[in-house]
Amino acid sequence: MIQILITGLFLLAQPSEPQDSLTVTQQGRTIATVNREDFTMPLPGTPMVDYEKYSKFIKQLDQKVYREPINAVLNDHGSIVPGRVGYKLYQQAFMEKFYAYFYGQGPSKIEVPEMNIYPKVDSELLAHISTQQLGQYVTYFNSSNKSRSHNISLSAKAIDNHVVFPNETFSFNQVVGMRTRNKGYKSAPIIVKGELSEGVGGGICQVSSTLFNAVDRAGLQIVQRYSHTRSVPYVPPGRDATVSWGGPDFRFQNQYNQPILIRAKRYGGSMIITLYSSDVINSRLRKIPKAPSRIPKEINAEQ
């Protein structure tokens, strides 16, 4: 009798599943628990799935399951860092499992079926398109202006390792995104030759202008480019590309039959952008003037 009582108390202490529960797991980890009644339409007769509630559940589940793919990149030493396959909820396969549970009996458990999402740029492609240098351009700036230098580094990082596929159009504003304080950009107003220049995100146009000249050197098709209303000190006259979120953009198209890899890096007071592709690319390079190595004196307007 005592043994039976102890056994009963032991069973009561164990966690039990609700009679109609569905436990959804991902890689063995529980991510959702629901019941049949949560999705049953209030109609007499044979139970039916409330599709509106099911769709809402699937949307929430997909957000939990989703893992973004990561492209392969080149590190600062030129070595390939492999990418990562992402995945999302395989909705058709999950629906079949869910309906089997819904019209069945008792509790059930579903390990979410995942659908792989492969990165656009894998190690093999990156190795293929990083062999032939198409165009390079170097501009210079005053590295003692910390805020402006920071903005240059930040925007250069945004376009570094970006791959432009054949017939694809690159948009500077779209790739770099909005330049805000929340994203780390700083106010960098300076005075050059007595005129106030730049504000939050100051320095971005030097990156876009450096990119324009590298792109032009590589013989790529310029789709959209605007010059500043006045000359800028870091490129020859007429060789700049002003950009502004919600305003002017710099865009170019890859008309070649091979992808183009952008490498962008700030080294001290130099901004260097180099374009690479496959060694089988049939490119037509252009001659362009070099940037001035001496820049005019500037005054930090915040001081």
UniProtKB/Swiss-Prot annotation:
It comes from the Bacteria. Pfam families: PG_binding_4, VanW. InterPro entries: Glycopeptide_resist_protein (IPR052913), Vancomycin_resist_VanW (IPR007391), YoaR-like_PG-bd (IPR022029). This is Uncharacterized protein YoaR. It comes from Bacillus subtilis (strain 168). The lineage of its organism: Bacteria, Bacillati, Bacillota, Bacilli, Bacillales.
